[in-house]
Amino acid sequence: MRLGLCVVALVLSWTHIAVGSRGIKGKRQRRISAEGSQACAKGCELCSEVNGCLKCSPKLFILLERNDIRQVGVCLPSCPPGYFDARNPDMNKCIKCKIEHCEACFSHNFCTKCQEALYLHKGRCYPACPEGSTAANSTMECGSPAQCEMSEWSPWGPCSKKRKLCGFRKGSEERTRRVLHAPGGDHTTCSDTKETRKCTVRRTPCPEGQKRRKGGQGRRENANRHPARKNSKEPRSNSRRHKGQQQPQPGTTGPLTSVGPTWAQ
């Protein structure tokens, strides 16, 4: 009988303890939830007393601000300068630009606006526009200079050397193009209109007729180049006499007679 009473007493005490513990736990949960709802700022769905907001509303962006050794979350409608917005289904975040002197960026490595007095060129910030680029008139952005409009290159011409197409093995060939439009009409700012490259062909002898024409042309050019040399030559005199012919003595006239050997009678 006593044993039965002891068992009943133990069961009743255990039930009382279990009910009391559940009540205490429920009260503690309600107290934490109430404190959390009071500490979270407007637009924050989940927050912590130590780290601030942990999750913002869907239309807001969470920004982690450093406070000593902690990072505190803040909900903002847009990201501040030096940050770009990264949207994802879980939560929108503000991520800091990693480009030096950048005020606004499209991604962590592509700037869209530099700090004051700096020039923007291909997603980077510079104190001056790089070589080969110029600043726009009303912005601090560097761009390529106005380009000339050029025609297509012509086919490569035949391989030649000194305007000859034969008698050589190594020569050159060229191709050309035209300027269709130049900014301000200044063609000097445009690219080259002629290109030349070396070429090698199988050596072929020039035709005989071409050689003769070249030789005759060379003689005519020499004659035209040195006309005094031809006039300086004196005509050959008829002073050459046949062997044995006697010249007339001064003061005598008449034909010359041959002087032959005299034979004794």
Curated annotation (Swiss-Prot):
How are the domains described in the entry?
The FU repeats are required for activation and stabilization of beta-catenin.
The TSP type-1 domain sits at: 147-207
Disulphide bonds annotated for this chain are: C40-C47, C44-C53, C56-C75, C79-C94, C97-C105, C102-C111, C114-C125, C129-C142, C148-C190, C159-C166, C199-C206
Q: Which CDD domains match?
A: FU
Q: Where found, per UniProt?
A: Secreted; Nucleus
From the UniProt record, list the FU repeat ranges: 34-85, 91-135
Classify the source by domain of life: Eukaryota
GO process annotations (BP): male meiotic nuclear division; positive regulation of canonical Wnt signaling pathway; positive regulation of non-canonical Wnt signaling pathway; positive regulation of Wnt signaling pathway; regulation of gene expression; regulation of male germ cell proliferation; Wnt signaling pathway
Composition skew (Low complexity), residue ranges: 245-257
What the entry lists under InterPro entries is as follows:
Furin_repeat (IPR006212), Growth_fac_rcpt_cys_sf (IPR009030), R-spondin (IPR051514), Rspo_Fu-CRD_dom (IPR043601), TSP1_rpt (IPR000884), TSP1_rpt_sf (IPR036383)
> Where are the glycosylation sites?
N137, W153, W156
Q: Does the keyword Nucleus apply?
A: yes
- Which organs or tissues contain this protein? Expressed in the dorsal part of the neural tube on 10 and 12 dpc, especially in the boundary region between roof plate and neuroepithelium. This expression is enhanced in the rostral part. Also expressed in other tissues such as truncal region neighboring forelimbs and mesenchymal tissues around the nasal cavity.
Classification lineage: Eukaryota, Metazoa, Chordata, Craniata, Vertebrata
Provide one Gene Ontology cellular component: nucleus
* SUPFAM superfamilies, per database record: Growth factor receptor domain, TSP-1 type 1 repeat
Please state the gene responsible for encoding this protein: Rspo1
Q: Which residues form the signal peptide?
A: 1-20
The record, for PANTHER family, names:
NEUROHYPOPHYSIAL HORMONES, N-TERMINAL DOMAIN CONTAINING PROTEIN (PTHR46987), R-SPONDIN-1 (PTHR46987:SF5)
Q: Per the record, a Pfam family?
A: TSP_1
Keyword Nucleotide-binding listed: no
**Subunit info?**
Interacts with ZNRF3; promoting indirect interaction between ZNRF3 and LGR4 and membrane clearance of ZNRF3. Identified in a complex composed of RNF43, LGR5 and RSPO1. Interacts with the extracellular domain of FZD8 and LRP6. It however does not form a ternary complex with FZD8 and LRP6. Interacts with WNT1. Binds heparin. Interacts with LGR4, LGR5 and LGR6. Interacts (via FU repeats) with KREM1.
PTM notes: C-, and N-glycosylated. N-glycosylation at Asn-137, negatively influences its secretion and enhancing effect on Wnt/beta-catenin signaling. C-mannosylation at Trp-156 by DPY19L3 is required for its secretion an regulates the enhancing activity of Wnt signaling.
Family annotation (Gene3D superfamilies): Hormone Receptor, Insulin-like Growth Factor Receptor 1, Chain A, domain 2 (2.10.220.10), Thrombospondin type-1 (TSP1) repeat (2.20.100.10)
Q: What is this protein called?
A: R-spondin-1
What keywords are annotated for this sequence in UniProt?
A: Disulfide bond, Glycoprotein, Heparin-binding, Nucleus, Repeat, Secreted, Sensory transduction, Signal, Wnt signaling pathway
